[in-house]
Curated annotation (Swiss-Prot):
Homotrimer. The gene is dcd. InterPro entries: dCTP_deaminase (IPR011962), dUTPase-like_sf (IPR036157), dUTPase_trimeric (IPR033704). GO terms for biological process: dUMP biosynthetic process; dUTP biosynthetic process; nucleobase-containing small molecule interconversion. It comes from the Bacteria. NCBIfam families: dCTP_deam. DCTP binds at R93, S94, S95, I96, G97, R98, D111, T119, L120, E121, Q138, Y151. The active site is at E121 (proton donor/acceptor). Belongs to the dCTP deaminase family. The record marks G108, F109 as: Important for bifunctional activity. SUPFAM superfamilies: dUTPase-like. Its EC number is 3.5.4.30. One of its GO terms (molecular function) is dCTP deaminase (dUMP-forming) activity. This is dCTP deaminase, dUMP-forming.
Length: 173
């Protein structure tokens, strides 16, 4: 079952944390999250799964920044979230998608117990000017059936900002 907007609001401070929270961003069954003003781009000709890849930080100015097609931009949500007993899911807003912008390539699924900012895998099909503070995606929550263990020690848990791929850690050992 997906939580309603009212259930999301009622769970704030208990099983769900969204900081900062703005009631205007609540939808019937989700909450809109905003884009932070920082982006990362990979600074390598060829990315390598077995090693950390160099990145370069971009700051989105007030007048926005034009994203190039066929280039991956890593962004993050302005909001910090925590979930105690629900599965958090992230989807792009349809208004953003209708401009040819994808906010996640594959990672729209969170784990029960996730704490941190959501890293966005932003990709566009045409050049587009984007702005920090835009409501770029929405988070929604599923109930979990059965017993579960909370996510507590994963690579991306308790992050403080944009997280480039840490896949290389899976190759250690």
């Amino acid at each position: 079952m997906i939580l309603s907007g009212k259930q999301i609001k009622d769970s704030l401070g208990k099983d769900i944390v969204i900081e900062p929270f703005n009631e205007k961003q609540i939808n019937p069954n989700s909450y809109n999250l905003k884009l932070h003003n920082e982006l990362l781009v990979y600074d390598e000709e060829v990315l390598d799964m077995k090693k950390p890849n160099k990145t370069k930080k971009l700051i989105i100015p007030e007048e926005g920044i034009v994203l190039e097609p066929r280039k991956l931009y890593l962004g993050r949500t302005l909001e910090y979230t925590e979930t105690d007993k629900y599965v958090p899911m992230l989807e792009g807003r349809s208004s953003i998608g209708r401009l040819g912008v994808f906010i996640h390539v594959t990672a729209g699924f969170g784990d029960v117990g996730f704490k941190g900012y959501w890293t966005l895998e932003i990709f566009c099909v045409e050049p587009i000017r984007i702005y920090s503070g835009v409501e770029i995606c929405q988070i929604y929550y599923h109930d979990v059936g059965g017993d579960y263990e909370k996510y507590s020690s994963g690579k991306y848990q308790n992050n403080k900002g944009i997280q480039p791929s840490l896949l290389y850690k899976d190759f250690i050992n």
